[in-house]
């Protein structure tokens, strides 16, 4: 059976002298593994359609008895030149691909998550120099949590329904169990969570509701970047019941 779908290439590895095994995220079939024969040959018919972070229309031979499918054809439909030529954009896209690889189960589709990823890739390729492209990695994580059923609330307490105003306190408690910032009068003793300063809460509120152009236009300090990165990886680990440690960090940062 031949299946065709929109796909984003996540990563791959060599398989024989001329072939590759690739992991891709498709819109309607979720994450799948494919074998691309001849893709490493100088005469490959695939061109750049199977390169990492490429958005391509993919056709493959599907079988219910296999979990590795043979590629029939692939054609790139979203250019990536302005991503590949900009290191900051490229690092952000690789980080997003890493999240899709580690959080998504095989053949479990989330069309809205695919559309968000494609939207970010399109935005990066159409835009010129961005002030802080890596901010969109955090936006992506926030939206991914929502798609996976454990979205976060940074504007309202999930217990009281009270709106969170960063002017009310220097620090706020985020409950991992409730998935939200808690009102100041809620007793959080014994709850698993993290104390966030008002600056970080303000950043998370912006990243949660802002447009891509706005979210990539302001700087986040190195210390706040590490705090947000650690906070989100812990949150995903708790709700997915497996540890996530994403290795791709913003330019100049290491973990």
Residue ranges: model-predicted function:
Residues 1-20, 25-255:
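Non-catalytic alpha-helical scaffolds and adjoining flexible linkers that form interface surfaces
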């Amino acid at each position: 059976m031949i299946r065709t779908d929109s796909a984003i290439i996540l990563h791959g590895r060599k398989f024989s002298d001329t072939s590759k095994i690739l992991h891709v995220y498709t819109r309607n079939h979720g994450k799948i593994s494919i074998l691309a024969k001849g893709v490493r040959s100088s005469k490959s018919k695939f061109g750049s359609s199977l390169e990492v972070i490429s958005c391509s229309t993919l056709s493959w031979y599907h079988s219910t008895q296999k979990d590795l499918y043979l590629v029939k054809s692939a054609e790139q439909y979203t250019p990536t030149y302005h991503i590949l030529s900009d290191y900051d954009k490229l690092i952000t896209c690789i980080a997003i691909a890493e999240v899709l690889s580690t959080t998504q189960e095989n053949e479990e589709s989330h069309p809205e998550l695919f559309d968000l990823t494609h939207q970010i890739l399109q935005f990066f390729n159409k835009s010129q120099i961005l002030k802080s492209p890596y901010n969109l990695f955090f936006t992506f994580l926030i939206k991914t949590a929502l798609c996976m059923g454990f979205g976060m609330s940074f504007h309202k307490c999930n217990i009281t329904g009270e709106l969170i105003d960063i002017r009310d306190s220097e620090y706020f408690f985020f409950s991992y169990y409730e998935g939200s910032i808690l009102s100041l009068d809620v007793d959080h003793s014994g709850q698993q969570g993290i104390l966030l300063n008002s600056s970080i809460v303000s950043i998370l509120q912006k990243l949660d509701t802002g447009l891509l152009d706005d979210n990539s236009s302001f700087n986040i300090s190195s210390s706040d970047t590490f705090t947000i990165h650690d906070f989100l990886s812990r949150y995903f680990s708790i709700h997915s019941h497996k540890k996530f440690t994403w290795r791709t960090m913003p330019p100049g940062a290491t973990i």
